[in-house]
């Protein structure tokens, strides 16, 4: 059987079957049967099948990869990349929102402000973090963090992975749209460098609120859009089952975003996606973060704001 801890996506069935065959052969080898060459041959075949599959993913398949439950999340990146991390809680207006986490720590020895959505990894943690869908208090906490970062002259790092802001009645009553707008404005107004990375899903205003940054990076199989494929399908076709068709038409991939000038850099993922080797993906992300901030060193507050403003103006010109 394939690794019981690994979740295979529907389109990965051929790879799962080969992995299962490898495990069967290894079990036979453990009993004394000499089949080392056969195991190596099947392993090589499985590796090639995986590489071929991921070299030609459709937008809908990338959507499935971006949502993979074993993909590294905010806490994984923070635990690996940030030392002396001190989380902050609450928006000083309503309460705490566990869907959007943030705080201060050190990145490669330098002080930094970090924030982002956390989806959770277990049933209990997913419910606690509301599947990464932040409420107004989450975005107001983000504004609070950014204001503190500017006050202390600290760079800001945003890790984005969310299906969107939470659309519940309570969230709307507490001013969800206003909170998203305030967070977006706070990002744009920062006088310190900010870097945003879309690690999985970057959906709607819930993502935009943290990604109006000097540098926007995106993992190879992440997605970024104003609306989820399912929601677009329901609106355009009045049929939620056409999500695959919607995804294939919406231009949501990292490659699309780079072509449009929406993101600056694509971070290559391990063969088979970030979920197959989270440690390698996190290490590569750390290097990309360091490079992005290095490119912004030496700029004063006015130059930082000008660069960021010009970046987003150019996006509009490219798309017009």
Swiss-Prot record:
Q: List, alphabetically, the Pfam families matched.
A: ACCA (PF03255)
- Could you tell me which cysteines form disulfide bridges? none
Q: Which domain of life is it from?
A: Bacteria
Any idea of its EC number? 2.1.3.15
Gene3D superfamilies on file: 2-enoyl-CoA Hydratase, Chain A, domain 1 (3.90.226.10)
What compartments host this protein? Cytoplasm
Q: Which residues form a coiled coil?
A: none
Give GO cellular component annotations, separated by semicolons. acetyl-CoA carboxylase complex
Query: Which keywords does UniProt give here?
Result: ATP-binding, Cytoplasm, Fatty acid biosynthesis, Fatty acid metabolism, Lipid biosynthesis, Lipid metabolism, Nucleotide-binding, Transferase
Instruction: Describe the location of the CoA carboxyltransferase C-terminal domain by residue ranges.
Output: 41-295
Tell me which Gene Ontology terms the entry assigns under biological process.
fatty acid biosynthetic process; malonyl-CoA biosynthetic process
- Role according to the record: Component of the acetyl coenzyme A carboxylase (ACC) complex. First, biotin carboxylase catalyzes the carboxylation of biotin on its carrier protein (BCCP) and then the CO(2) group is transferred by the carboxyltransferase to acetyl-CoA to form malonyl-CoA.
Q: Which family does it belong to?
A: Belongs to the AccA family.
Q: Please give the NCBIfam families that the UniProt record associates with this protein.
A: accA, AccA_sub, PRK05724.1
Q: Which PANTHER family match?
A: ACETYL-COENZYME A CARBOXYLASE CARBOXYL TRANSFERASE SUBUNIT ALPHA, ACETYL-COENZYME A CARBOXYLASE CARBOXYL TRANSFERASE SUBUNIT ALPHA, CHLOROPLASTIC
Name the chain's protein.
Answer: Acetyl-coenzyme A carboxylase carboxyl transferase subunit alpha
Q: Which organism is it from?
A: Bradyrhizobium sp. (strain ORS 278)
């Amino acid at each position: 059987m394939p690794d019981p801890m690994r979740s295979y996506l529907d389109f990965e069935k051929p790879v799962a079957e080969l992995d299962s065959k490898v495990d069967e052969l290894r079990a036979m080898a453990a009993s004394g049967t000499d089949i080392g060459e056969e195991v190596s041959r099947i392993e090589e075949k499985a590796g090639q099948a995986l590489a071929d599959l991921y070299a030609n993913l459709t937008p809908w398949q990338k959507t499935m990869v971006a949502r993979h439950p074993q993909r590294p999340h905010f806490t994984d990146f923070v635990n690996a990349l940030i030392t002396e991390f001190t989380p902050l809680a609450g928006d000083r207006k309503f309460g705490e929102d566990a869907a959007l986490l943030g705080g201060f720590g050190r990145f490669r020895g330098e002080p930094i402000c970090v924030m982002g959505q956390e989806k959770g990894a277990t049933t209990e943690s997913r419910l606690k973090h509301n599947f990464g869908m932040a409420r107004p208090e989450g975005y107001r906490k983000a504004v609070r963090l950014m204001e503190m970062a500017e006050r202390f002259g600290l760079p800001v790092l945003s890790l984005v992975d969310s299906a969107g802001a939470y659309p519940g009645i309570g969230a709307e009553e507490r001013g969800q749209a206003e909170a998203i707008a305030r967070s977006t404005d706070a990002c744009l107004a920062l006088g310190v460098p900010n870097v945003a990375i879309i690690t999985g899903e970057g959906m709607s205003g819930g993502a935009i609120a943290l990604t109006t940054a000097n540098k926007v990076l995106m993992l190879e199989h992440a997605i970024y859009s104003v609306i989820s494929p399912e929601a677009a399908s329901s609106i355009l076709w009045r049929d939620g089952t056409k999500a695959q068709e919607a995804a294939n038409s919406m231009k949501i991939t990292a490659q699309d975003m780079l072509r449009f000038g929406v993101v600056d850099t694509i971070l290559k993922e391990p063969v088979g996606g970030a979920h197959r080797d989270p440690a390698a993906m996190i290490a590569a992300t750390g290097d990309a973060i360091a490079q992005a901030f290095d490119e912004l060193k030496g700029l004063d507050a006015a130059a930082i704001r000008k660069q960021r403003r010009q970046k987003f103006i150019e996006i509009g010109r490219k798309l017009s």
